[in-house]
Design a protein with these regions (language model features):
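C-terminal structural segment of proteins
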Residues: 1-306, 317-326, 331, 350, ...
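Glycine-biased, low-complexity coil/linker segments
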Residues: 312-315
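Ferredoxin-type iron-sulfur electron-transfer modules in oxidoreductases and energy-metabolism complexes
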Residues: 94, 245, 337-353, 380-471
């Protein structure tokens, strides 16, 4: 899929490579979108990937002295979901991150990547647009700051130049008088692209009069848009039922939806009104936290990010040498597979066929493995990420030669039919039990949102999870 894979050890090195390769190179962090685009042949002419995941301190969420929140380019969606700062001072962003994909995807996918992919249905763009975010772009020639509202030029198009990378996402933290909410309408409750999404933020005075309002809409125009007519109308108003109704109607003025396989334009337009009203009603009722759990299930383990290569005494890996990795506590040195996904590397080069390929696009979870402690979809991970990493596959799930307690529960409850999806369910479940030894039904459901079974109807699988959770 690529000819060269650079795992850089300094930011300067990444920028120099971008300057040299330009249109032929792409920055890799989570790679969850890019891998699929390369597999499908959507991205043409890309010869080199520049992996920045080993650079230190780019995965931080910080609050500066002026009250601004900063996200580094390696901050993942699950980091935002779990961050007390984001939950307390940027709740709509935490809610949007929770809606992205499944836990295995959120452990890899970055907020920066979601912004750069630039789909009008990408969840995190909408709240960041409402939060008045600014992105900082850097190259060998210097850096510049661009308001997120000016970052997009069309569907999947941005002002990012071929030699630039996004180095920072910044926005003002919400103040105590400000309340906000993100709502996503999709065809399923997980692993689904938005039909419509909305982020609403209102600043209320002591009389509950709106001092200012910000409303952003996703999946209803070529880019994420602000509902300026509704924002202007709400300013100075008290949030009565009639005001909420009119705000929903005015929000429709900003929407220019299309017909597609997920919904006709008329439905989308009507749902803009309804979802905007729902968000405003929840804010009025003090229920803006919505469905975001108090303790979200992450499947992230104890070390979700790889150690910098500099700690191993090694410089950049160009992807044309060997991959040295530890799989199931056994060290491997493998001279092949650098141009593959981790899934195919494990099956074809490491000789471990237990990890299955069900969809090769991050939908089914059959390929779930642990990479540096976190559950990931191995079909969406470049194989060179295994270099100096710790990997656990289904073959390594047994504890001291005895089946894992979830494996034993699957046998006891007859939770296997064709068995093709079983390795993925077991890996997700084992990480759940590590993170939450006695999960409830809702937590079990959260853990397997990224795993599909086409045989059992899930009842036996859920019974096995519940049995294991009681042991």
């Amino acid at each position: 899929m690529w000819q060269q894979y650079y795992t850089v050890t300094t930011l300067d090195e990444a920028l120099q490579l971008l300057a040299q390769q330009r249109e032929k190179a792409r920055i890799v962090a989570g790679a969850t979108d890019l891998i699929i685009e390369l597999e499908r042949g959507v991205r043409k002419g890309i010869d080199a990937l520049i992996d920045i995941t080993r650079l230190p301190d780019l995965d931080k969420i910080t609050l500066d002295e002026a009250g601004g929140i900063h996200l580094g380019p390696l901050v993942t969606h699950n980091q935002c979901v779990a961050s007390p700062l984001i939950q307390q001072r940027a709740l709509p962003l935490a809610q949007a991150c929770w809606e992205v994909g499944a836990p295995q995807i959120r452990n890899r996918a970055t907020v920066a990547g979601n912004l750069i992919t630039a789909s009008p249905a990408n969840d995190t763009i909408t709240p960041l647009m409402a939060l008045d975010a600014v992105v900082t772009l850097i190259s060998v020639n210097g850096q510049r700051s661009v308001p997120l509202r000016e970052f997009y030029t069309g569907v999947r198009r941005t002002v990012l130049q071929p030699d630039e990378m996004l180095i920072d996402i910044a926005f003002p933290a919400l103040q105590p008088s400000e309340r906000g909410m993100f709502i996503k309408l999709a065809l399923r409750r997980a692993q689904a692209i938005s039909v419509v999404d909305v982020a609403v933020i209102v600043d209320l005075d002591q009389t509950q009069t709106v001092k200012s309002a910000r409303i952003a809409l996703g999946s209803v125009a070529p880019t994420i848009v602000r509902a300026t007519d509704a924002e202007t109308y709400l300013t100075g108003q008290t949030l009565t039922p009639g005001v909420l109704e009119q705000a929903g109607v005015l929000a429709q003025n900003a929407a220019h939806p299309i017909d597609d396989v997920r919904a006709p334009s008329e439905y989308r337009l009507d749902m803009v009104r309804i979802v905007t009203m729902r968000a405003l009603r929840a804010i009025v009722a003090g229920e803006e936290r919505g469905l975001l759990p108090a303790q979200p299930i992450l499947l992230a383990g104890v070390r979700p990010h790889p150690l910098p290569l500099s700690k191993s005494g090694e410089g950049s890996n160009r992807g044309d040498g060997v991959i040295q990795t530890t799989i199931n506590e056994i060290e491997y040195t493998i001279p092949t597979g650098q141009d593959k996904t981790l899934l195919r590397f494990l099956r074809e080069d490491a000789g471990l066929p237990g990890t299955k390929e069900g969809c090769a696009e991050g939908e089914c979870g059959a390929c779930t493995v642990f990479l540096d402690g976190a559950a990931v979809m191995s079909c969406m991970v470049p194989a060179p990420c295994a270099h100096h990493a710790q990997i656990t596959t289904i073959e390594g799930l047994a504890v001291e030669g005895a089946p894992h307690r979830l494996q034993q529960a699957f046998v006891a409850e007859a939770a296997v039919q064709c068995g093709y999806c079983t390795p993925g369910f077991l890996m997700s479940g084992a990480k759940l039990l590590e993170e939450c030894p006695h999960p409830n039904k809702a937590e079990i459901a959260q853990a397997i949102t990224g795993n599909l079974c086409r045989c059992t109807g899930y009842y036996k699988i859920l019974a096995a999870f519940e049995k294991a959770s009681k042991e």
